[in-house]
Amino acid sequence: MANYYEVLGVQVQRFPEDIKKAYRKLALKWHPDKNPDNKEEAERRFKQVAEAYEVLSDAKKRDVYDRYGEAGAEGSCAVGRPFEDPFEYIFSFRDPAEVFREFFGGQDPFSFDFFGNPLENILGSRRNSRGSRSRGSAPLFSTFSEFPAFGGGFSSFDTGFSSFGSLGSGGLSSFWMSYGSDGTGSFKSMSTSTEIVDGKKITTKRIIENGQERVEVEEDGEFSLKSFIINSKEQLLRIDTK
């Protein structure tokens, strides 16, 4: 069994925030979806990083590991005797993918639907044939080399920004998104898109923070009508700008 502190690259007397930051960086670096050409090694490292995080991020498990090391992680003390309360002390590791999703607030940064297109759900039947937009079958994040924000700086995942121009004749005039983490495991992403529908300028903002989704739609940029969707529940709010 590898030394969990060495796996995360942290010292023994580090703060919980340092452990979370180390996990975030290494989990993103070794995620199997990001390493298709080295998947076997990536899966091994990804699993190892998840196990190290599960132990060192939990105060009780970390205390047992600090005192008994590998024997503690396997549920036996230094002299080879089992702990009196195996349920409390034996480390049961979860699926590393589950640890990864939980860390990022239930969202998967490697999934296209993580950012999605809120206009598809909000506008629906309001969009005519000219206003509809076709998209290719390949996911947006299928190849990280084609997505600058997820390129060389993706391993730190501290901040990011990407912008796109028109994506075709569908009327989408602009799209940008930003994302980041504060180092404590919380995650926030925001995307903004502008589209012309029936001659009207529709601007949509979508914010996902720690698993909570908020969508805001503005019509013609006059702030006279806003449609909010919070966790798939739509709410209408009219604001008097006079």
From Swiss-Prot:
Protein name: DnaJ homolog subfamily B member 3
Coiled-coil blocks: none
Record key words, sorted: Chaperone
Functional description taken from the UniProt entry: May operate as a co-chaperone of the male germ cell- and haploid stage-specific Hsp70 proteins.
BP terms from Gene Ontology: chaperone-mediated protein folding
A Pfam family annotated for this UniProt entry: DnaJ
Residue intervals of the J domain: 1-69
Protein's organism: Macaca fuscata fuscata
GO molecular function: Hsp70 protein binding; unfolded protein binding
Expression sites by tissue: Testis specific.
PANTHER family: DNAJ HOMOLOG SUBFAMILY B MEMBER 2, SIMILAR TO DNAJ HOMOLOG SUBFAMILY B MEMBER 6 (HEAT SHOCK PROTEIN J2) (HSJ-2) (MRJ) (MDJ4)
InterPro entries: DnaJ_domain, DnaJ_domain_CS, DNJB2/6-like, J_dom_sf
SUPFAM superfamilies associated with the record: Chaperone J-domain (SSF46565)
